[in-house]
Amino acid sequence: VVGGDECNINEHRSLALMYA
């Protein structure tokens, strides 16, 4: 599930940036 993992990481990064 590499694609899914990458997508998840991308979403997490976006959320972290928004929360930062």
Swiss-Prot record:
Record's comment on post-translational modification: Glycosylated.
An example Gene Ontology CC term for this record: extracellular region
Tissue expression from the record: Expressed by the venom gland.
Keyword Ligase: no
Keywords: Blood coagulation cascade inhibiting toxin, Glycoprotein, Hemostasis impairing toxin, Hydrolase, Protease, Secreted, Serine protease, Toxin
Gene Ontology molecular function: serine-type peptidase activity; toxin activity
Enzyme class, first EC level, given as a word: hydrolase
Keyword Hydrolase assigned: yes
Compartments (UniProt record): Secreted
Residue span, Peptidase S1 domain: 1-20
EC number(s) reported in the record: 3.4.21.-
Modes of activity regulation: Inhibited by calcium.
Biological-process GO terms, alphabetical: proteolysis
Family statement: Belongs to the peptidase S1 family. Snake venom subfamily.
Function: Snake venom serine protease that selectively cleaves the heavy chain of protein C (PROC). This activation is thrombomodulin-independent.
Subunit relationships: Monomer.
Name used for this protein in its record: Protein C activator
